[in-house]
């Protein structure tokens, strides 16, 4: 990968011609010639404008030739890489000799290629250093071109380069490139603003027509692969440097980027083009965000002359620049580029540390990874940042007095520069050159690398023992460091890009080129080959063995390398992919074809089109040739040399003089934590995880509903904490994220011609995944995946198609929360993990599960440090220093009695506004219409169910929706706590909770008190009653806090036992089901301070109820069907417990206020086609939403008694007839033919066999089958999870028997019902009447917990 970049620079610099001393005189002469030509052409233009302009017909060709385009592109065919092939680089690397090909005896190039030529009306004019000149170019369509064709490619006449700046390679014939003969009658003149290649754009002609050719360019493959049509070249706005009679594409470096700052108008032009590309890539072209961003950029450029790219734009631009690099053979890896944004670095020591971290990350102990580090951008060209090395790692070259060179001949000049700066070398063959960098336009500093940072590979041969005696070696990491990164008009003069080697770059170029190590003849003699005559092919034999040695040496030491055959195949795959995705792939055939094996590689036989796109990587002149030395330093002898710094000195300086800077530098890698939550538990864990990651990363946290999905492709580290709602659904704030992820998956499949007909929607995919996968996998999922398998040994796997996807550069881990009482346990978290993997993401860990039934907190506390450690290892950060602090922070909250307090406040707001802010929801204040009405005839052991009517003016909802009620804790519980807390003087005084926080300023660190960001000012009594969860058994983290405030040693030891013994805690928690007051009474010496306790308590979450009314039946009202929950703990023998919300609602009286919000349940709405049959299945309070359904049809019937209503069957279940809810209403509905049939299942009625709703479904399935299958009816299931699963399995079994289908076919059928929104579920959790299910689920969870390593 790096070959293309690295070699370009090594050999490019070696063959660079020194500047002429009269360069200024030549430039003046060129300008004078230019002015004369302009005058002549203007005269011709005036004559031509008197005639009718003719249009150039393009039906026979996609391009123009003849005098088609001005030559003189300063960078010309310079591209971004050399003919040598360092794979995974935006350009090339180590050497250039194999690029051009030597002439054969017939005068034809030995290397098979054919380039289109460009004709101009005048000799080539090349602009250097950013000079702007206006030129008129005449197109007469008269040029011709020829080229030799090997491998079946013939000579073509009249091949030309198109105005769009493209050049065809590998034998393009004239019939496809020449303009129509009819267009050669009259010259056509075009004016153009000419600039350097690093910043030139095509403009319109005099008639306002675009110069870009719009016709596809046909590219053949001589070996018989499908031909492709390239239209991407139409977007190439840069000018090639070929002339009418000369193709210069085989010249290594036609020109370098200008050193002057780019002008504002040109930056504006580039920025507009780049933003269009960026917003197109995220499918937001012309959106409000696009227009706003363009306005910001334009304003900044007009004000300051430049602008700052966002981090996401920078990452996108870096990847796209690599993708656009026409000379790189390893571009299939373009999306797997790790971008290190170091634009904040302002010193050479900071640059050195960042580069050391780059090398450490990219080397990765031999498992190389592609990466780019980007330093601050160019502003005025007087304060540039530069890396003076052509490669970060290279060997010194010493020229002796007798002309002999020790070391690498390519680096002789730079070695002399280092010596002048004061570097002391050993003078040996394999000295690693120091890093030389300059910051902000200042003179350079040099730094010696720590020896352990550089990985070198001694070269051996699998057959020749004498080979190791040659003492050859090479370094593992090719890292180009002198190219200019050009993106959106902004130029980054200091960037370093690294990938991995292709074997020929080392074996053929670096070691065998005569201008490099020149080992070819030495090896041949050792092999006892006849070197006297070329007919013995001794060179060919020797170079093959040299490449075998290189591959053998790297692979045997598990260092990433790729052979040229694999690289060629990967490029062909990339070429094919790009042709499908972008309708083109810029490619320089001369540089793509490897320097070994030529025509037996597939790339040799592929026609290619050469053109240049932005963003791009550009050549620069060596820094030591352009640097303006301060006070003559570096110009004269005897001056004090620049100071040398070594790694330890820098580390010490950072540690003691700028701890803050060092911390910021180590956190330049962004880590994003996403969460989706229904109760707040996932958010709580996500915040803890974000704090943990913050010890080593730039950690950020987002709720999924607030996250911009377009950013996900550019994340470096993504950690997801996701709850599952109901029976496998995402929480409300995760719905959109799940849909967007699934849309990415569908798009990725369609782009690669794949179709997955088995999964039709994200929800069905979620349930299918969880049903198939979870129960097969033990909870020992917290297991590290061996990432060493990815690139070890033969790296042909590196280029397999399966390793790429839109998220191929994202490392991720998922912690899934849920309850194993549900069949689709943790379905949403598992879905996110599956789909991130399918989109190409790299797992740090397999998905980990947190089971609400048992050990959820224990699982999280075990998983979080592990994922932190692996993340540090992945990004080559040292976890040892921060892991202990991070783990301590995870175990112990940072709040103490000294950092939290309650102070009087006069800012008490209304309860609805306070709850809205606290829960981040719009909360409405409503009133009870009357005292709740009892729906059951009480009998012994019967559970009370009531109908609550609420006045809710202005609240909009649909039948099937839910309402969230914010309850209040019982008064006895609140009063008991107030008596046990320390620091409560007046519980009815309005207080504000404040936290002591540290702030960083230019004057240092200072502390100040700030209000809690969520807990509002209120009385302590109201806070405990309305805002905090006091009834859920306290977590082990809270018990740890309470243990610290026990005065009695025995109480403290018992609490610590619960904290440290997971099994003891789970037994105590599920047996006692203690609320907070119970704990304080069980441990009487524990008296925690009120401020600290409030800061640790979790929010009192809303309780959700299905709405039992239709807004068209009862305007401005909401009806609820509520079961009153009361039970006893300790297997029915302990204290009585009360459901928080149901008992709160049962105590309401007329006009009492209650606080609520509506949550839409789109998946449980009535069908849009009201003619379809409806089957309602819901025992107990599961009937609640169905009342809203039948009320809706009552309204329709009242409005139009003749209207035909759908068939509606109701399956209802209860214990006995005394608790048959809405019995009278149902009877009236049947009478009015709104309910067609009503089935009642009684499970505890005397003298009647025990019957459940699923039993009735099985009995009536023949009729139900007609409704479901033949009439395409809808099934609605509402109730607890156990009932819903039984119903599902019953329908599944009945369909299998009815249609004689396999289990897989039935499962597919039911998933299809979900996809078609014909199988609807509204499921709530385990109810107290299913305690046996609760116990069974918990036992299963404990078994899984015990199986964890």
From Swiss-Prot:
Regions of compositional bias (Gly residues) in chain numbering: 142-159
Function: Catalyzes the conversion of L-arginine to L-citrulline producing nitric oxide (NO) which is a messenger molecule with diverse functions throughout the body. Truncated isoforms (isoform 3-isoform 6) are able to form intracellular complexes with the full-length protein and serve as dominant negative inhibitors of the enzyme activity.
Stored InterPro entries: CysJ-like_FAD-binding, FAD-bd_FR_type, Flavdoxin-like, Flavodoxin/NO_synth, Flavoprot_Pyr_Nucl_cyt_Rdtase, Flavoprotein-like_sf, FNR_nucleotide-bd, NADPH_Cyt_P450_Rdtase_alpha
Protein name: Nitric oxide synthase
Residues covered by region (Disordered): 23-195
Annotated control of activity: Stimulated by calcium/calmodulin.
Residues at which (6R)-L-erythro-5,6,7,8-tetrahydrobiopterin binds: 250, 591, 604
Keywords of the record: Calmodulin-binding, FAD, Flavoprotein, FMN, Heme, Iron, Metal-binding, NADP, Oxidoreductase
Gene expressing this chain: Nos
GO cellular component annotations of the record: cytosol; nucleus; peroxisome; plasma membrane
């Amino acid at each position: 990968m790096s070959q293309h970049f690295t070699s370009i620079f090594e050999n490019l610099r070696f063959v660079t011609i020194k500047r002429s001393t009269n360069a200024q005189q030549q430039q003046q002469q060129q300008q004078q010639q230019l002015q004369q030509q302009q005058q002549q052409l203007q005269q011709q233009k005036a004559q031509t404008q008197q005639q009718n302009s003719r249009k150039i017909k393009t039906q026979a060709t996609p391009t123009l030739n003849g005098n088609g385009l001005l030559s003189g592109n300063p960078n010309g065919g310079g591209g971004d890489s050399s003919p040598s092939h360092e794979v995974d680089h935006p350009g090339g690397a180590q050497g250039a000799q194999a690029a051009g090909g030597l002439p054969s005896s017939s005068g034809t190039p030995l290397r098979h290629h054919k380039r289109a030529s460009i004709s101009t009306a005048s000799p080539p004019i090349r602009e250097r250093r950013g000079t702007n000149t206006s030129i008129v170019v005449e197109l007469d369509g008269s040029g011709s071109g020829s080229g030799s064709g090997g491998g079946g490619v013939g000579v073509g006449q009249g091949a030309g380069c198109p105005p769009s700046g493209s050049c065809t390679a590998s034998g393009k014939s004239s019939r496809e490139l020449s303009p129509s003969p009819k267009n050669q009658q009259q010259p056509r003149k075009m004016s153009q603003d000419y600039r350097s290649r690093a910043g030139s754009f095509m403009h319109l002609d005099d008639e306002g027509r675009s110069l870009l050719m719009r016709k596809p360019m046909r590219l053949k493959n001589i070996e018989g692969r499908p031909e492709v049509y390239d239209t991407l070249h139409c977007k190439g706005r840069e000018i090639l440097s070929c002339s009418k009679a000369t193709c210069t594409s085989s010249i290594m470096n036609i020109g370098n980027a200008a050193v002057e700052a780019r002008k504002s108008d040109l930056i504006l032009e580039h920025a507009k083009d780049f933003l269009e590309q960026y917003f197109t890539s995220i499918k937001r072209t012309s959106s409000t965000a696009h227009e706003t961003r363009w306005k910001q950029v334009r304003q900044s450029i007009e004000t300051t002359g430049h602008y700052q790219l966002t981090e996401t734009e920078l990452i996108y631009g870096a990847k796209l620049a690599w993708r656009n690099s026409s000379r790189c053979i390893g571009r299939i890896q373009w999306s797997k580029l790790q971008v290190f944004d170091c634009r904040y670095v302002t010193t050479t020591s900071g640059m050195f540390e960042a580069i050391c971290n780059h090398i450490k990350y990219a080397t990765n102990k031999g498992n190389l990874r592609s990466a780019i580090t980007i330093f601050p951008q160019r502003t005025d060209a007087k304060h540039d940042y530069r890396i003076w090395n052509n490669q970060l790692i290279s060997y010194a070259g010493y020229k002796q007095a007798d002309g002999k060179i020790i070391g690498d001949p390519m680096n002789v000049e730079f070695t002399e520069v280092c010596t002048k700066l004061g570097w002391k070398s050993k003078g040996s063959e394999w000295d690693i050159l120091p890093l030389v960098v300059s910051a902000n336009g200042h003179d350079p500093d040099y730094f010696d690398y720590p020896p352990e940072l550089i990985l070198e590979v001694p070269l051996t041969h699998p057959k020749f023992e004498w080979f190791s005696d040659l003492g050859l070696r090479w370094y593992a990491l090719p890292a180009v460091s002198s190219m200019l990164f050009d993106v959106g008009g902004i130029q980054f003069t200091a960037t370093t890009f690294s990938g991995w080697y292709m074997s020929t770059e080392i074996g053929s170029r670096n070691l065998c080129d005569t201008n490099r190590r020149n080992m070819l003849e030495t090896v041949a003699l050792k092999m006892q080959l006849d070197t006297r005559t070329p007919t013995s092919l001794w060179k060919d034999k020797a170079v093959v063995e040299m490449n075998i040695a290189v591959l053998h040496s790297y692979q045997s030491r598990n260092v990433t390398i790729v052979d040229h055959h694999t690289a060629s195949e990967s490029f062909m795959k990339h070429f094919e992919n790009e042709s499908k995705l972008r309708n083109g792939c810029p490619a320089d055939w001369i540089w793509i074809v490897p320097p070994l094996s030529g025509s037996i590689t597939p790339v040799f036989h592929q026609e290619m089109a050469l053109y240049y796109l932005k963003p791009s990587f550009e050549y620069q002149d060596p820094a030591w040739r352009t640097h303006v030395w301060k006070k003559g330093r570096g110009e004269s002898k005897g001056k004090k040399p620049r100071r040398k710094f070594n790694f330890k000195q820098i580390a010490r300086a950072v540690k003691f003089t700028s701890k803050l800077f060092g911390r910021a530098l180590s956190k330049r890698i962004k880590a994003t934590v996403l969460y989706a939550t229904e109760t707040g538990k996932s958010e709580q864990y996500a915040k803890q995880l974000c704090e943990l990651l913050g010890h080593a990363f730039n950690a950020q946290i987002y709720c999924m509903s607030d996250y911009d999905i377009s950013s996900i492709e550019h994340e470096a580290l993504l950690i997801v904490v996701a709850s599952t709602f109901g029976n496998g659904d995402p929480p409300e704030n995760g719905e959109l994220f799940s849909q967007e992820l699934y849309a990415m998956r569908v798009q990725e499949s369609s782009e690669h011609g794949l179709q997955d007909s088995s999964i039709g929607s994200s929800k069905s995919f979620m349930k299918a995944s969880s049903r198939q996968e979870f129960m097969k996998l033990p909870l020992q999922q917290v297991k590290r995946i061996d990432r060493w398998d990815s690139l070890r040994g033969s790296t042909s796997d590196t280029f397999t198609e399966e390793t790429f996807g839109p998220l191929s550069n994202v490392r991720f881990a998922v912690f899934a929360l849920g309850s194993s009482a549900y069949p689709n346990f943790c379905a949403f978290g598992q879905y996110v993990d599956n789909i991130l993997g399918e989109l190409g993401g790299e797992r740090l860990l397999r998905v980990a599960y947190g089971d609400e039934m048992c050990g959820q907190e224990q699982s999280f506390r075990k998983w979080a440090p592990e994922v932190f450690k692996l993340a540090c290892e992945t990004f080559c950060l040292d976890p040892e220093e921060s892991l202990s602090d991070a783990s301590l922070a995870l175990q112990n909250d940072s709040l103490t009695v000294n950092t939290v307090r309650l102070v009087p406040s006069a800012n008490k707001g209304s309860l609805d506004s306070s709850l809205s802010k606290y829960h981040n929801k719009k909360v409405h204040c409503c009133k009870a219409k009357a005292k709740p009405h009892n729906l059951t005839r009480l009998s012994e052991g019967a559970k009370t169910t009531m109908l609550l009517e609420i006045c809710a003016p202005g609240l909009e909802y649909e039948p099937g929706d839910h309402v969230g009620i914010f309850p209040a804790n019982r008064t006895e519980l609140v009063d008991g706590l107030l008596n046990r807390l320390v620091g409560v003087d007046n519980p009815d005084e309005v207080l504000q909770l404040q936290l002591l926080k540290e702030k960083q300023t230019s004057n240092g660190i200072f502390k100040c008190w700030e209000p809690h960001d969520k807990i509002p000012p209120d009385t302590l009594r109201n806070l405990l009653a309305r805002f905090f969860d006091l009834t859920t058994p306290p977590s082990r983290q809270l018990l740890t806090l309470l243990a610290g405030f026990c005065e009695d040693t025995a109480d403290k030891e018992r609490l610590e036992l619960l904290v440290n013994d997971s099994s003891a805690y789970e037994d105590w928690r599920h047996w006692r089901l203690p609320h907070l007051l119970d704990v304080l009474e069980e441990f009487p010496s524990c008296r925690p301070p009120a401020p600290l306790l409030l800061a640790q308590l979790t929010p009192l979450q809303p309780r959700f109820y299905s709405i039992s009314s239709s807004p068209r039946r009862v305007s401005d009202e909401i009806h609820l069907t509520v079961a009153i929950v009361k039970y006893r703990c300790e297997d029915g023998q302990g204290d009585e417990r009360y459901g928080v919300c149901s008992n709160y609602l049962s105590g309401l009286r007329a006009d009492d206020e209650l606080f609520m919000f509506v949550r839409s349940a789109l998946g449980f709405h009535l069908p849009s086609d009201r003619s379809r049959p409806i089957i309602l299945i819901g025992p107990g309070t599961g009937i609640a939403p169905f009342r809203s359904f039948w009320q809706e049809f009552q309204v329709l019937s009242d409005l139009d008694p003749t209207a035909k209503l759908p068939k509606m069957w109701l399956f209802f279940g209860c214990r006995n007839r005394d608790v048959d809810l809405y019995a009278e209403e149902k009877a009236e509905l049947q009478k009015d033919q709104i309910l067609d049939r009503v089935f009642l299942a009684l499970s505890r009625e005397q003298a009647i066999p025990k019957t459940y709703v699923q039993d009735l479904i099985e009995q009536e399935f023949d009729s139900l089958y007609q409704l479901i299958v033949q009439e395409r009816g809808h099934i609605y299931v509402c109730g607890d999870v156990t009932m819903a699963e039984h119903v599902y399995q019953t329908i599944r079994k009945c369909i299998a028997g009815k249609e004689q289908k396999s289990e897989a076919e039935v499962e597919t059928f039911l998933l299809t019902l979900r996809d078609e929104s014909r199988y609807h579920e509204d499921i709530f959790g385990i109810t107290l009447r299913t305690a046996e299910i609760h116990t069974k689920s918990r036992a299963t969870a404990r078994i899984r917990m015990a199986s964890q390593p």
